[in-house]
Regions:
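NUDIX/MutT-family hydrolases
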Residues: 154-191, 198
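N-terminal leader/linker segments that precede catalytic domains of diphosphate-processing enzymes
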Residues: 1-90, 94-111, 115-142, 146-149, ...
Length: 241
């Protein structure tokens, strides 16, 4: 039996990916988002994809390429929000005037989860991605939680939960599937994840799931999973205006 990968191996892989994106050798990722229509009057936004060493119970799934105690920071948006209500997301939001994506991602993460940005090592950014549903162009910022700090729901009007999800749980084929959105005679299928948590099972779908799915593929972490398995939506999407 092979030894479990060391958790800090993931940091080296993430650093290699951001370096390849920066010098143009990473290839084109996130095809599902790149094929989507670009917003006509987009607003700039950034999200923080923050990996670290789990502070809770390690995953029960023995993933091939990541350790059981590697995690990623996620939050569940409040169900009362007008945009993406109830969805699991990365911390993040719109850029203020004159603000850069890295600064915005760290600021929003602090405002939404209470984390201390001083404990985050920013590894770099990925390609800016269109989010046509809410008219945004989003820059993912990859980070490593070198010195973790407590996180919590800071504003209940914005978030319902803040949690650190074991990456091995996300990679577990038993927790993977697709969601299907049907509207106006059209159908959109996308990757989805079930994330076990103390408060129940969270469904990760939409933009966040597409980014995680594409990121795992690019890092070589993905395990074979059933792409025909449908996971029912717990919160139906509604159009923004």
């Amino acid at each position: 039996m092979s030894a479990e990968p060391a958790p800090h191996r993931a940091r080296a892989q993430l650093e290699a990916l951001t370096a390849a994106v920066a010098d143009g050798t990473a290839g084109r990722g996130f095809s599902a988002l790149r094929s989507a229509p670009v917003p006509t009057d987009p607003r700039a936004a950034a999200v923080l994809i923050l990996f670290g060493i789990l502070d809770g119970v390690p995953s029960g799934h023995a993933a091939d390429d990541v350790s059981r105690d590697l995690d990623v920071l996620l939050l569940a948006r409040a169900t009362t929000l007008r945009s993406h209500p109830g969805q699991v997301a990365f911390p993040g939001g719109r850029l203020d005037e004159g603000e850069e994506p890295i600064a915005a991602a760290l600021r929003e993460a602090e405002e939404e989860t209470g984390l201390d940005p001083a404990g985050v090592d920013v590894l770099g950014t990925l390609e800016t991605l269109p989010l046509a549903f809410s008219q945004h162009l989003v820059t993912p910022v990859l980070g490593w939680w070198q010195h973790p700090s407590p996180v919590r729901v800071v504003d209940e009007a914005e978030s319902a939960a803040v949690f650190r999800a074991p990456v091995a749980d996300l990679l577990d084929p038993a927790n993977r599937g697709v969601t299907v959105v049907r509207r106006d005679g059209q159908e959109w299928r996308g990757p989805a994840f079930h994330v076990p948590h103390a408060t129940g099972i969270h469904l990760v779908w939409g933009f966040t799931a597409v980014v995680l799915d594409g990121l795992f593929d690019r890092l070589g972490w993905t395990e074979p999973w059933d792409r025909a398995r449908e996971l029912p939506l717990t919160v139906e999407p509604r159009p923004t205006r």
